[in-house]
């Protein structure tokens, strides 16, 4: 970084030149911010006594100055000449970013109402006396009447100021801020890349995290997509099964490999490279998220479409960098956030610090964050493929949050005609009709869907109760659909009411609804208003515990 400090204004220059002993600079460095605020709130006499008066030599240094002269001693950030010099130096610098650190006064120009005064943020306007003071202080050419009417001063069209302003606006691309993108569209990967994940794994078991990593490995073989992938890992790359990326695409290091890694004899040893693609951020989630935002907004900032994929312990995502996630939404980011090792009972033995039971709820608060909690590899593949289509073919300004688990189990073949349901949030996974005495609707998401399937078998064998099993890939998307349906009906009272997707799925089904997830009950409770059936939710309210998966459940 090229750092330019603009600390003291021009009125200090003569005093600093006279200060041969360095005592003035010493005094400047002794004072803390709170003192500097008081100096500007109290006036010249106070500054003479409290700032210069500490040392006899400094009091003598300003003996020929009036209190008004001392009051004029300005801060660098309010000196047009110093600010100009700093800005000029900044634009002439090449090869590194520049930051200008300027010392200023809180509420500068507000007079008694706000200058160096601890007012609340409820102070929204100045009274007439303050406005007139502001006019006089900055020589704004307005009459008293114009000031009292709070009129703006506009320079004439031929003035130097107006010419300069227009020239700068044109160089910046126009008068109104505009989000433009001329990025070349990424060609969608062929569907056959995802075909392997639509098939049954047979007796072979794997986690949804491993399924995702295998998808990314397949995408790295696609010449159109591979250069645009940005895998970001703050920690635990090997836990997620991503060590194969180290040799394949390398870890980015701007100075290259500078050491022999301890695992150098292994096939998947750490390989750092100046042109590496993996961003290994260390245990720094804020830095990793910032890198993700940079890549996720490159389509508009740099006209380059990127596909950032940030994989992290789900507990250390939205909870730890929530404000950055909100900023990502505000910045219209496009990319994938993967909350790995998700689920409060699925990540066994890690205790309350690690066991995530609410990241999906946190994600639901960001309007353009599309979130899913898939159970099977075909669901993960369908969601990921749709994310690529929406963000990079349709160029929608959304980003995806997908939770992935570390529980290994077999994955079935993709049922027919379930794409719409997977993407909307739920689909009928299986019907158990054994002419039982009654029936229930069982809803499950993530790894807990498998517990729901097991519960269905118990209900049939031990209690003679039939059930329909629904895989809920996104309670969040179902809720959004329900709210949008409610809104349409509210705004169109004379039309036939529309039905939410949840209502369409369940209205003709018999029995109460039992919804279960590995998150707090509030997660599945979100869809309660969109059905008139009896609704029971099961979840993981409370803290996590260090125990086995079986005992936790």
Residue ranges and their predicted role:
Residues 1-412, ...:
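Thiamine diphosphate
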């Amino acid at each position: 970084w090229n750092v330019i400090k603009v600390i003291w204004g021009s009125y200090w220059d003569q005093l600093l030149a006279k200060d041969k002993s360095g005592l003035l600079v010493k005094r400047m460095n002794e004072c803390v911010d709170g003192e500097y605020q008081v100096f500007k709130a109290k006036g010249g006499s106070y500054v003479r006594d409290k700032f210069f008066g500490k040392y006899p030599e400094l009091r003598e240094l300003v003996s020929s100055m009036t209190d008004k002269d001392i009051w004029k001693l300005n801060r660098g950030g309010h000196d047009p000449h110093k600010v100009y010099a700093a800005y000029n130096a900044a634009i002439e610098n090449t090869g590194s970013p520049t930051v200008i650190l300027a010392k200023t006064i809180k509420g500068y120009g507000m007079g008694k109402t706000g200058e160096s005064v601890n007012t609340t943020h409820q102070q929204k306007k100045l009274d007439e006396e303050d406005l007139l003071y502001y006019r006089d202080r900055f020589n704004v050419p307005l009459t008293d009447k114009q000031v009292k009417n709070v009129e703006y001063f506009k320079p004439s069209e031929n003035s130097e100021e107006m010419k300069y302003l227009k020239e700068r606006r044109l160089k910046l691309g126009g008068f109104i801020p505009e989000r433009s993108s001329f990025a070349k569209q990424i060609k969608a990967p062929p569907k056959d890349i995802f075909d392997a994940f639509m098939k049954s794994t047979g007796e072979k078991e794997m986690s949804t995290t491993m399924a995702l990593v295998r998808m990314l490995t397949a995408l790295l073989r696609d010449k159109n997509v591979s250069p645009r992938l940005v895998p970001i890992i703050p920690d635990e790359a090997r836990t997620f099964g991503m060590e194969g990326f180290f040799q394949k695409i390398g870890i980015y290091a701007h100075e290259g490999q500078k050491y022999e890694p301890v695992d150098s004899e292994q096939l998947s040893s750490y390989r750092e490279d100046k042109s590496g693609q993996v961003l290994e951020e260390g245990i720094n989630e804020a830095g990793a998220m910032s890198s993700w935002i940079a890549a996720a907004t490159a389509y508009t900032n740099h006209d380059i479409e990127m596909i950032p994929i940030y994989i992290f312990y789900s507990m250390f995502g939205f909870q730890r960098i929530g404000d950055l996630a909100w900023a990502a939404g505000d910045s219209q980011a496009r990319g994938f956030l993967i909350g790995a090792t998700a689920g409060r009972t699925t990540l066994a033995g890690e205790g309350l610090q690690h066991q995530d039971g609410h990241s999906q709820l946190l994600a639901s608060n960001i309007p353009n964050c599309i979130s899913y909690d898939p159970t099977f590899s075909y669901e993960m593949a369908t969601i990921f493929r749709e994310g690529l289509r929406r963000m990079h073919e349709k160029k929608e300004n959304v980003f995806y949050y997908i939770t992935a688990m570390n529980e290994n189990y077999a994955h079935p073949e993709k049922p027919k005609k379930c794409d719409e349901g997977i993407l909307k949030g739920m689909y009928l996974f299986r019907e158990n009709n054994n002419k039982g005495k009654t029936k229930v609707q069982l809803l499950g998401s993530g790894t807990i869907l498998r517990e729901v399937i097991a519960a269905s078998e118990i209900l049939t064998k031990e209690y003679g109760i039939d059930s329909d099993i629904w895989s809920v890939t996104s309670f969040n998307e179902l809720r959004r659909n329900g709210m949008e349906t409610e809104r349409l009906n509210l705004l169109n009272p004379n039309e036939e009411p529309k039905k939410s997707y949840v209502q369409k799925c369940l209205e003709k089904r018999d029995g109460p609804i039992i919804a279960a997830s590995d998150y707090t009950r509030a997660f599945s409770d979100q869809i309660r208003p969109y059905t008139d059936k009896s609704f029971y939710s099961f979840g993981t309210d409370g803290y996590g515990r260090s125990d086995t998966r079986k005992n936790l459940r």
